[in-house]
């Protein structure tokens, strides 16, 4: 590698130009603007404050482009999802917390809405893990466990009653983003995270931070429980 040479003061960063090779890009060599826009917007949400500009000049008569920067990061991601899907949120603010241990870090945003569906999007080093993995499993386990503990502690659940995972996830939109130094994906397509140490790490952070939030926001906690109990 020759490294990067000096640049003029008005220049910055690295430019990469390429022409898609049909032997490598087997499905298509024509890029879909909407697919690229969705991916770029996703990255802008995952990296709060990062500005990403997409410009499509292939058709001079009809150029397309968009500049994206979200200071609220994945909190705005949740708001964007609810707005575009026409969903009514159960609380004004998105539940948001972070945590780290050693070289591992997790960032979570979640909010309940008036639908009956769950939407959990998980990412590892900005890669969308479509099939989930250890980070998502840790979140799901902690969510169910924490809500049951809170419910029994504050009398929202009877001693013999219990909320199931599908009950507490009904109407939930959540974004889970973990940053690791060594991602272990279970396939070449990187759709599932396999790092075993991430499950207890995420589970511990969610259990602590979510319990603190519920205790500090009893009205939101009550709304979540009303919805979860109705789902039984």
Where are the language model's segments positioned?
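GHKL-family ATPase ATP-binding module
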Residues: 1-232
């Amino acid at each position: 590698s020759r490294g990067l040479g000096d640049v003029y003061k008005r220049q910055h960063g690295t430019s990469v130009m390429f022409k898609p090779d049909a032997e490598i890009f087997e499905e298509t060599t024509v890029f879909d603007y909407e697919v690229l826009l969705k991916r770029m917007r996703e990255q802008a949400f995952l990296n709060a404050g990062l500005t990403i500009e997409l410009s499509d000049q292939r058709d001079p008569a009809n150029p397309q482009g968009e500049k994206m920067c979200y200071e609220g990061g994945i909190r705005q991601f949740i708001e964007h999802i609810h707005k575009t899907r026409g969903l009514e949120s159960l609380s004004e603010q998105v539940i948001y917390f972070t945590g780290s241990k050693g070289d591992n870090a997790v960032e979570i945003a979640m909010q309940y809405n008036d639908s009956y569906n769950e939407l959990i999007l998980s990412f590892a080093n900005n890669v969308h893990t479509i099939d989930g993995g250890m980070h998502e499993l840790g979140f799901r386990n902690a969510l169910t466990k924490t809500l049951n503990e809170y419910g029994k502690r504050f009398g929202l659940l009877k001693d013999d009653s219990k909320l199931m995972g599908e009950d507490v996830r009904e109407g939930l939109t959540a974004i889970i983003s973990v940053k690791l130094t060594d991602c272990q994906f279970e396939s070449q397509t990187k759709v599932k995270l396999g790092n075993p140490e991430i499950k207890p790490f995420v589970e511990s952070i969610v259990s602590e931070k979510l319990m603190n939030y519920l205790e500090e926001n009893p009205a939101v906690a009550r709304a979540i429980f009303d919805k979860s109990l109705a789902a039984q």
